[in-house]
Amino acid sequence: GGCRRYHPGPHQYTDDQMRRRIQKLKWKLKRMGGVDIVVTHAPPYGLGDGDDPAHWGFESLVELLDTYHPQYLVHGHVHIRYGARERVRDYNGTTLINATERYTFEIPDRPVDGKQLGQVIYKTRQKREDPLERHC
């Protein structure tokens, strides 16, 4: 998650930092046979991003699309009301969805050769145990 660094603050990354974050997933992606759905905060560069630094997308996400060819990439950050942008577009067989504000879509349940269905390979947040709850 996160967006392009445009001023000091949390959850902002340079493109090199985002590329390293994606690289950390390389072996998991290989072991799992790829990825079907990618969910990000910011869009890929040139594919639904904005003209100002605060809304630029990541080139490293374009590289991810070109390498792994997921079925979907769902992003936010660039609101539709900021200008005439497509909510849904295609990039080399990947459906890109700008899900800002809200967007409902259905994903067909179908097997894909070489991929294991129903497995999560990366979780960013886990519930932390409250030490006070253990002693109640």
Q: Where is each model-derived feature located?
A:
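Catalytic metal-binding/acid-base residues of hydrolase active sites
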Residues: R4-R5, P43-Y45, H77-R81, R102
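Short, hydrophobic beta-strand segments that form beta-sheet elements in well-ordered domains
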Residues: V38, L73-H75
